[in-house]
Amino acid sequence: MPLAFSDHNPSLTYARSENRGSGFGPSPRRLQPAHRPVPPVRRHARRRPITHCAQPITSGAEMIRALGLQKAREMIARRDVLVAGAAGGASLVLPGPGGAVALPKGTGAAPGAGAVGKFPVPTLDPTTIPKYVTNLVIPPVMPKARHSERHGIDTYVIGVRQFSQQVLPPTLPSTTLWGYGSLGDNSTFNYPSFTIEAKTDRPVRVTWVNDLVDSQGRFLPHLLAVDPTLHWANPPGGNAGRDSRPTFTSTPGPYTGPVPIVTHLHGGHSTEESDGYTEAWYLPRANNIPPGFATVGSFYDEFREKFDDAHGLKWAPGTATFQYANDQRASTLWFHDHTLGLTRLNVYAGPAGFYLLRGGECDLPKGALPGPAPAFGDAPGTRYHEIPLAVQDRSFNSDGSLFYPTSREFFDGFAGPYIPTTDVSPIWNPEFFANTMVVNGRTWPKLEVEPRRYRLRFLNGCNARFLILKIADSPTARPAQSAVPFWQIGNEGGFLPAPVRLERLLLANAERADVIVDFTGIPEGTELYLINEGADEPFGRGEPGVAFPVADPATTGQVMKFVVGPLVSKDTSVPPDRLRLPRIRPLGSASVTRRLSLTEANSSSPLVPPGTPVQNLLGTLDAAGNPVALAWADPVTENPRLNATETWELHNFTVDAHPIHIHEVAFEVVDRQPFNGSPIPPESWERGFKDTVIAYPGEITRVKARFDHPGRFVWHCHIVEHEDNEMMRPYQIGGRRKQDH
């Protein structure tokens, strides 16, 4: 029988079960060991029978139905992925699509006609980056705008700008990034953003400004290579062609700018015009926007008018103003860019930050949990015992610039032909796993802690990497023994029904975990390490080191270091095992059950190796239970009645786990059910409410939500490479729109 992780036993024992729901249960596939004499390394790409993109049934789905999940697992070969980087002094040669290339800092270069289009990118060997020499940066609080508290609303003016920051240790070059900051204070621009502190039932109004312009007011090019063959914002298409998948007569080079943005408050209970809808983007107010370019997305004007009608404020060009009612449970939220077809690149460039909602009946009284957290106006040197931790993976070039693939060849070695000769996009990679771990904008930082309790708010901000976090006394020993447990008290939707003791945290992309870590009694001078036992590849499930190779212990298997210092403050917080968490009001019964599908489409071209993935898709199921794959532009199929409570069944026909995020709602995880098995209750850390859930391969994941804001929203996979290439769908609450786009 397979082994499954049991979170109920503090000694980290394992329960034997055929149908256990944990992500540490049986793996959907067996992998060959990674061979990485020097990174980067390309393992064998997944090869499957050719399937047509328009076909509603993928080969993986057919195999699961015909053979059963376990047999399909054995027969479906895993694709390979590449961990970016190269040995010190070496160069990584990457091809440019159609002879046009994007240089590391976003400038364009076009070799002569007929040129191969390859150029050297010197990448930074992650093993040469010193670890634990830089102190962890604890994000300060974002300052409010002047006169911000008029009418009982906290107001902010926050822009996205380009700047240089020391992400790598000081002995190495700085990195050009994008990030949020208060337009009234240049010192607040940072990666990740300063934190927005909000109070339950007190509105927050933010004017989000696209300030990606230079000192002369000209638009800045993108830092990374943008693939214009996806279904994306497409400003060059003009108003008629925006938010579309363009057609080409020859393989295009990368789009470099101007760059559209739109900010989404992830986990917010938002109205449609303030949700950061992916087609409500806007360009900077630059003085050199090319003639004929669309300057806003398809929904921008409609939402601008709606916001004006509701709040008496019309958005200025290059901006959007959103208002958040904060009428939800105290919780850990975050904000990030959400532009159609560009999310993976815009967020990788830096724009993201925490939004912490406090107060109300669903919070704990002051002093019950470790504190303080950062507050506006804190004196320098203030010690914090509540700390948000944004964990991300990044790769770098030797000049300190960000590395992200500029060609599809990076993923699986397929060097073309690309669109339009085949259906393979020239730049987009199905997933990307970087080679360096970054916490709060610093590579492998260290934090001195007192021997007392700390409240840590974890966010998995990676593009594609699932994290399995553990606190160990060795940075490299695998398997690692837990040295200090986590007490998880909350997730995306606020506090759990009761604290849960865990030896490790499984966090999918965009998931959050609110935990208490108790360093009480640990001797001064002790060094402890936050390590990652997730994989350097797509996650399915299974025991680390058994079902899949753990992350490289020398690089991506290490996250940060804790050094226990002297006790200098009194800890009056309640021990986690004695905490009584706020009561949770469960949702009522559902009136509708929707059957939804998750699939992967492979290339249909005879010029492309069989099994080459070209899209990930959401959709529905037909009467026989077969997936009906739908693209972003297909008609809306999810249309809950206003104030209806519905159950959504996520049928995963792929061999990967997908973190599914539904905008506007906080949902309950009802259960999971293998395709040929019985329902399994949710994990203890998934109780209460969530906004992102792991849909495991070969299973039905059921969630239940109440849809109480009318309008247009989206649901999608939060592996952002998937999201950017069709694994996102619009949904409509409260009937049809007066007009569609």
Annotate the PLM regions.
Residues 59-60, 64-73, 78, 83-91, ...:
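N-terminal, post-signal-peptide metal-ligating segments of extracellular/periplasmic oxidoreductases
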Residues 3-5, 9, 14, 20, ...:
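N-terminal secretory signal peptides
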Residues 270-287, 295, 391, 395, ...:
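Histidine- and aromatic-rich segments of cupredoxin/plastocyanin-like copper-binding domains
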Residues 473-493, 653-687, 720-723, 732-737:
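Active/binding-pocket-proximal capping segment
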Residues 158, 206, 337, 389, ...:
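Divalent metal-coordination and catalytic microenvironments
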Residues 208-212, 460-462, 650-654:
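Asparagine-centered strand-capping/turn motif at beta-strand->loop junctions
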Residues 595-669, 691-719:
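C-terminal substrate/ligand-recognition segments
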Residues 240-365, 497-562, 654-658, 683-741:
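Extracellular/periplasmic metallocenter environments
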